[in-house]
Amino acid sequence: MKNNPLVTVGVALYNHEKYIVKCLESVVKQSYKNIELIVIDDGSPDNSYSVAKSYLDNQEDNKNYIIKTRPNKGMCNTLNEIAKLAKGKYISFVGSDDYWFIDKIEEQVRFLEEHNEYALVHSNSLKVDENNNETGVLDFSGKKNQGDIFESIIYGKGGINTPSHLYRTEVYNTIGYYDPSLKFEDTDFWLRLTKHFEVGYINKSHSY
């Protein structure tokens, strides 16, 4: 890859002290290295923040890692706070109880760098149980997954796999941020995005 643009990875952390290290480890160990990691703990009552901070503080190259905690404001407000701090050309959010394949960012950045017609790329996900045993695949290959998928989402014939997305940060200039008044913030955001932009798809699992 000729260019290595900065990628912002956001983690909205809440009550996942059991899973957060595995999540962060999958980001820190990405084969793609030009990453800005922003973790905001949304007032977790457990030890999520201290566990996450301890892990990141012990990383040798942590100058591009930001972690903070504050009183609970809800998922949407946390996602928006991260998005407004983002400096990357691309952005991806990983759930604090999810984790990624090591080549996720590298392959998706390459895809978007080669396909300027797409604002977002997504992939499949492997399903795992609490013991990390694989139980299936969240496979989008049989759905309308690429190009203009706005109407397909409305009619339930297509969609975006939220755990495996990467999109251009500049889309916020057109569609705005997540709507805190809604319960299903992802669906609303993807509808607004696909109303204005086309999306790409890689038929491969990149997340758990």
Regions found by a protein language model. Name each.
Residues 35-43, 66-70, 95-96:
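Short beta-strand/loop segment that forms part of the nucleotide-sugar
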Residues 103-136:
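Conserved donor NDP-sugar-binding/catalytic core segment of glycosyltransferases
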Residues 69-86, 107:
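Glycine-rich, basic loop-to-helix element that forms the pyrophosphate-binding segment
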